[in-house]
From Swiss-Prot:
Class of the enzyme per the UniProt entry, highest EC level: oxidoreductase
Record-linked NCBIfam families: VhuU
EC number(s) from the headed UniProt entry: 1.12.99.-
Identification of the protein by name: F420-non-reducing hydrogenase vhu subunit U
GO molecular function, one term: metal ion binding
Cofactor(s) listed: Ni(2+)
Subunit structure: The F420-non-reducing hydrogenase vhu is composed of four subunits; VhuA, VhuD, VhuG and VhuU.
Binding sites annotated in the UniProt record for Ni(2+): 20, 23
Keywords recorded for this protein, A-Z: Metal-binding, Nickel, Oxidoreductase, Selenocysteine
Gene: vhuU
Organism: Methanococcus maripaludis (strain DSM 14266 / JCM 13030 / NBRC 101832 / S2 / LL)
Family stated for the protein in its record: Belongs to the [NiFe]/[NiFeSe] hydrogenase large subunit family.
């Protein structure tokens, strides 16, 4: 199960460190084993 609070925190941190993150068209979140947990494609 994916913890929404952790994902939100990760997103906030990534936005803080990478200004372009928030405008990224494609984002993939992977766990320790390299499995894709979350894949986001921003609609144009």
């Amino acid at each position: 199960m994916v913890d929404e609070a952790k994902l939100n925190l990760i997103e906030i941190v990534l936005r803080a460190y990478d200004p372009u993150y928030s405008c990224a068209a494609h984002m993939i979140v992977k766990d320790e084993q390299g499995k894709v947990l979350l894949e986001v494609k921003k609609e144009e």
